[in-house]
Amino acid sequence: MELFPVAVNGVSHAEDPFSGPLTFIAPWNYKVLATLMFVVTAASLSENFAVMLVTFRFTQLRKPLNYIIVNLSLADFLVSLTGGTISFLTNYHGYFFLGKWACVLEGFAVTYFGIVALWSLAVLAFERFFVICRPLGNIRLRGKHAALGLLFVWTFSFIWTIPPVLGWSSYTVSKIGTTCEPNWYSGNFHDHTFIIAFFITCFILPLGVIVVCYCKLIKKLRKVSNTHGRLGNARKPERQVTRMVVVMIVAFMVAWTPYAAFSIVVTAHPSIHLDPRLAAAPAFFSKTAAVYNPVIYVFMNKQFRKCLVQLLRCRDVTIIEGNINQTSERQGMTNESHTGEMSTIASRIPKDGSIPEKTQEHPGERRSLAHIPIPENKVCPM
């Protein structure tokens, strides 16, 4: 099977897409795309580099539950470094000037790192479910468990992104001619089987994990809130986490649903005529996830923000770490910290995962969940 047939992605290329721009697309369209990719890539690289740098500098952030957060930032950083940078350059030139094999490598790298980031979100959801709901009783999330999660993410993603390089489907130039992607437009049944399998394992399955884990987590929080009082403050952790979960799921859907829907529609109807500029939109949406993932999953964590601010002020890291150690208990008890709220709830759930019966207490003795000392897991971005 030829990697690049005469007709590439449904566009008849008497003009080689690797030798010059498509003549029926005005040059200014490519300049607009280049500008957008420059903004997205610059923002993503700076944000995700900040996440990795701060985690490296502050030992308080190097906790098992944060391993997958850093992994997400690494994957997003690599997506932007490879796909974002190359997309900016190729759109600036108006065509994929790097050649056929560079197209294969770029298509593989962007798809691989993108799926690593996507599955990192699913593993993060599972780990939060594991910590809060305690499905295995008193077994805690430790470094070896987090490391196994990372190994799964990178291995599973590689298994489902290497086949096009080896002949099961292919990586080819996109319809607009400036990026490379899996060959959605192939009419070959052999290629269709890969697209369907890829759609199930790299979109439906992780989305299912995310939805199920967060729904069970919210259900557990609701039970805890109902058990420990009817005061507004007792409901606050549940409301905060519910809002955060909604944001996470919506962000996931915004980033990946257009790309998944596009791949299925084009696979089902290979001869469909789409404007190349419209066909480029789903891939652009998926790349923007690298910008808002750090905001949702990292920058909204109070302790991380404090470390980042201190680092930007160029203060001595040793002094900063000492200050954080001295105030960690107070941070855990603050109402503003998602970390404290999640750890508080986890500490109130019995080791067997059951919900204790309500006990009679005097009005003056009733306390909010947010004011209970936190014994562990103080760094738990939520």
UniProtKB/Swiss-Prot annotation:
<comment type="similarity">
    <text>Belongs to the G-protein coupled receptor 1 family. Opsin subfamily.</text>
</comment>
<protein>
    <recommendedName>
        <fullName>Opsin-VA</fullName>
    </recommendedName>
</protein>
<keyword id="KW-0812">Transmembrane</keyword>
<keyword id="KW-0297">G-protein coupled receptor</keyword>
<feature type="topological domain" description="Extracellular">
    <location>
        <begin position="89"/>
        <end position="103"/>
    </location>
</feature>
<keyword id="KW-0157">Chromophore</keyword>
<dbReference type="InterPro" id="IPR000276">
    <property type="entry name" value="GPCR_Rhodpsn"/>
</dbReference>
<feature type="topological domain" description="Extracellular">
    <location>
        <begin position="266"/>
        <end position="279"/>
    </location>
</feature>
<dbReference type="GO" id="GO:0004930">
    <property type="term" value="F:G protein-coupled receptor activity"/>
</dbReference>
<keyword id="KW-0675">Receptor</keyword>
<dbReference type="InterPro" id="IPR002206">
    <property type="entry name" value="Opsin_pineal"/>
</dbReference>
<feature type="transmembrane region" description="Helical; Name=3">
    <location>
        <begin position="104"/>
        <end position="124"/>
    </location>
</feature>
<keyword id="KW-0472">Membrane</keyword>
<feature type="transmembrane region" description="Helical; Name=2">
    <location>
        <begin position="68"/>
        <end position="88"/>
    </location>
</feature>
<keyword id="KW-1015">Disulfide bond</keyword>
<feature type="compositionally biased region" description="Basic and acidic residues">
    <location>
        <begin position="349"/>
        <end position="368"/>
    </location>
</feature>
<keyword id="KW-0716">Sensory transduction</keyword>
<feature type="region of interest" description="Disordered">
    <location>
        <begin position="330"/>
        <end position="371"/>
    </location>
</feature>
<feature type="topological domain" description="Extracellular">
    <location>
        <begin position="169"/>
        <end position="193"/>
    </location>
</feature>
<feature type="transmembrane region" description="Helical; Name=4">
    <location>
        <begin position="148"/>
        <end position="168"/>
    </location>
</feature>
<feature type="topological domain" description="Cytoplasmic">
    <location>
        <begin position="301"/>
        <end position="382"/>
    </location>
</feature>
<feature type="disulfide bond">
    <location>
        <begin position="103"/>
        <end position="180"/>
    </location>
</feature>
<feature type="transmembrane region" description="Helical; Name=1">
    <location>
        <begin position="36"/>
        <end position="56"/>
    </location>
</feature>
<dbReference type="InterPro" id="IPR017452">
    <property type="entry name" value="GPCR_Rhodpsn_7TM"/>
</dbReference>
<feature type="transmembrane region" description="Helical; Name=7">
    <location>
        <begin position="280"/>
        <end position="300"/>
    </location>
</feature>
<dbReference type="GO" id="GO:0016020">
    <property type="term" value="C:membrane"/>
</dbReference>
<dbReference type="Pfam" id="PF00001">
    <property type="entry name" value="7tm_1"/>
</dbReference>
<keyword id="KW-0600">Photoreceptor protein</keyword>
<feature type="transmembrane region" description="Helical; Name=5">
    <location>
        <begin position="194"/>
        <end position="214"/>
    </location>
</feature>
<keyword id="KW-0807">Transducer</keyword>
<keyword id="KW-0681">Retinal protein</keyword>
<feature type="topological domain" description="Cytoplasmic">
    <location>
        <begin position="125"/>
        <end position="147"/>
    </location>
</feature>
<dbReference type="InterPro" id="IPR027430">
    <property type="entry name" value="Retinal_BS"/>
</dbReference>
<feature type="topological domain" description="Cytoplasmic">
    <location>
        <begin position="57"/>
        <end position="67"/>
    </location>
</feature>
<keyword id="KW-1133">Transmembrane helix</keyword>
<feature type="topological domain" description="Extracellular">
    <location>
        <begin position="1"/>
        <end position="35"/>
    </location>
</feature>
<feature type="compositionally biased region" description="Polar residues">
    <location>
        <begin position="330"/>
        <end position="346"/>
    </location>
</feature>
<dbReference type="GO" id="GO:0007602">
    <property type="term" value="P:phototransduction"/>
</dbReference>
<feature type="topological domain" description="Cytoplasmic">
    <location>
        <begin position="215"/>
        <end position="244"/>
    </location>
</feature>
<dbReference type="InterPro" id="IPR050125">
    <property type="entry name" value="GPCR_opsins"/>
</dbReference>
<feature type="transmembrane region" description="Helical; Name=6">
    <location>
        <begin position="245"/>
        <end position="265"/>
    </location>
</feature>
<dbReference type="GO" id="GO:0009881">
    <property type="term" value="F:photoreceptor activity"/>
</dbReference>
